[in-house]
Amino acid sequence: MGRIVLVVVIAAAWLLGSCTTAMPPPPPPAGRPAVIENSVGMSMVLVPAGSFRMGSDEPIERLAADFPRYEPERLRSIDDEAPVHEVRITRAFYLGRHEVTVGQFARFLAESGYVPESVADGTGGYGFNPAYDPSLTPRRDAFEGRNPAYSWRNPGFAQGDDHPVLNITWNDAQAMARWLSIREGRRYRLPTEAEWEYACRAGNRTRYQGGDHPSVLLRTANTFDRDSARHWPKWRDDASPGADGHPFTAPVGSFAPNAWGLHDMHGNAWEWVADWYAADYYSRSPVNDPTGPLAGDVRVRRGGSWHSWPFYLRASFRNWNTPQTRYTLVGMRLLLESEP
């Protein structure tokens, strides 16, 4: 019993020591509302122009101490988060308060006639199947696929219209942004990687909104926790602390927003961003409004998902896939450019 109490006390001290005071949302620029609702019911939050320090320079030794289950080689592989560098976002923009939902994506398909790639190419997507054994497959992937049984309609578990849409490709996300742009006569797009991290941090330098310790995720993010671990017992020791009642996706907005009013910037669904990926891009990134490499093979996704462990939910963590990838963890959040 004494050991349990000591662990709790240490964790609490760590949490309190790692928290910083969140920056309050700045007043909106003159003439621009702080929040707008678009023609398909998306709530868009005005993100101000400003500067921030992008990336992470945490020493490997600290990461190894804080995430002891991760192999040193895995920790060394995140050198793409460095160097920490100054970024200036020169124009305010509107960003979706929530990830794009199943219902919003369904409306896009119904009104545009667009066919998502998981359906158009006949190969489907990925999904959860309790009878599927990852150890029997060459990739040892946690999910079954590709399989035509899975798509944005069916990730292998029940979703309501208010859950984040999954199994969409980067190209699908681009198509929805183009459709909305034509429909409303103003430009929608995916955020750049820099815009995404700027909005995620909302003025903070901590790993997660609210602090550095994974315990803060319980109220702010839908992650791989004890509820999810019931379906993947071999990964129970990697789960986030606690249980949030959502073993799979949660309705968007179920968890506390960050300081600028954005929900699910950590967890629920990985979010495609606009940039091509390059491991060394931060060493040559311009200060003003970086947009990533001019070309590449894979596009960046950010934020982690309902199936992510705390290490991968950090604000600085970068991941990537080909633009044609569709997966039961990956969705999107759209940006609306604000008029000057």
Show which residues each predicted segment covers.
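Functional-site microenvironments in short loops/helix caps that host divalent-cation chemistry
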Residues: 53, 58-62, 66-77, 115, ...
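Short, compositionally biased
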Residues: 2-143, 170-171, 178, 204, ...
